[in-house]
Amino acid sequence: MHGRRLRMPLAAAAAILAAVSLSGCISQKNPVATFQVVDETYKIELTTPELQQHARDLLAGEDVASIPNGVVVRDDPGVNAPWSWHIDPASLEFADNTIEVCDGLPSYVEDGTVTSDRYCPWSAEIVSID
């Protein structure tokens, strides 16, 4: 009888410890930067510490490369809803200059006016990091 009483609390304790240990393994969501392009906004996930710091520097007004440039993933909004596309976070870089073919408004990506596989809005300004 004593063995059963002891097993039950030990089993419960083991289950609680396992749950606590596993919850520590769950990764935190990456920050998401919101950019304003004229009167439209779009969002990009920041997946590396370097990109996160660069975005914070931009938000603070530092003089760093400011044009977000990345590969467009169509038919998947990701963090960029309500748009039907997002920027592949693994391809994101910030540039001082880019070619004109990837410049434009987020709505131009949406409607296919921007035909490049990359999006690099020259007038983009970071407005928040969440």
Residue spans of the language-model regions?
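Bacterial N-terminal signal peptides that target proteins for export
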Residues: H2-A12
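C-terminal motif of bacterial Sec signal peptides marking the signal peptidase cleavage site
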Residues: S21-G24
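Function-determining sites in protein domains
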Residues: I26-D130
